[in-house]
Curated annotation (Swiss-Prot):
The gene is ycjF. It is found in: Cell inner membrane. This is UPF0283 membrane protein YcjF. Disulfide bonds: none annotated. NCBIfam families: hyp_HI0043. It comes from Escherichia fergusonii (strain ATCC 35469 / DSM 13698 / CCUG 18766 / IAM 14443 / JCM 21226 / LMG 7866 / NBRC 102419 / NCTC 12128 / CDC 0568-73).
Amino acid sequence: MTEPLKPRIDFDGPLEVDQSPKFKAQQTFDENQAQNFAPATLDEAPEEEGQVEAVMDAALRPKRSLWRKMVMGGLALFGASVVGQGVQWTMNAWQTQDWVALGGCAAGALIIGAGVGSVVTEWRRLWRLRQRAHERDEARDLLHSHGAGKGRAFCEKLAQQAGIDQSHPALQRWYASIHETQNDREVVTLYAHLVQPVLDAQARREISRSAAESTLMIAVSPLALVDMAFIAWRNLRLINRIATLYGIELGYYSRLRLFRLVLLNIAFAGASELVREVGMDWMSQDLAARLSTRAAQGIGAGLLTARLGIKAMELCRPLPWLDDDKPRLGDFRRQLIGQLKETLQKAPTRREN
């Protein structure tokens, strides 16, 4: 059956019409008002790692102080005096035919020569580490250049320094992707997207493994002194592996330049307190309730180890970061928390068995 039609309904008031926003009248500013006009600036929120990155940069940046110049000048003068005195002793021993003294002078000359050779080798390694910063500047210039002819030679030099063989699949894909009509910016960009991620992936794995080992070891270690020694040893090994991965051989002085960052990494007590305070936001209620003090310290040590690895990766990397390819601390944080969660969940299971 069909329903009967409803009666008509008459409304007293008019229908409401949607009022579209109207544009304001045009305003013209005179010269006085234009001088007093200033655009509003939004306060950008500080980055999560900005303050700590500034501290790391300050720790790595060598300070050219007057005392350092005086010490270097004194050492140079002392070395020149030792060499001059040795030459004089050698001449006197030769004239007087004092063969014992002449043999001692020869032994001293060999020792001094070995010391000079070591200093030259260390200086060369330190120069190589500083040269990597110049290579990043050169790569940054090429990424903003519209010229041609320099990008391919530069990328081939980087591949040779990193020990990438010519038959490597990533390098072969890069050779197949470039052609003569491309400029330097396009050639370097292709290298950054095809070849450089091979080394970056290996560096990320090294950082993730070292951070996980630091987290788990600190969480189960009962001695604070052992914790500090373990962190220092693991971080030094991490620096060496990352530098070797990017084709840089670290010497004593170049390693000392990064050792200050390791000292910052040892002092992880403050970060551990922060991890305990914000643990409720990172994990579930159950896991945060079971998170012990040692486990929180382990997470803090792992996060700072990951930060150290990211900074060492940035210093040893020949190319600047492009787009979003820079590793984030949050990625390693999620991995550490996941591994710690699995460890805490496996512990009660083993006890029950």
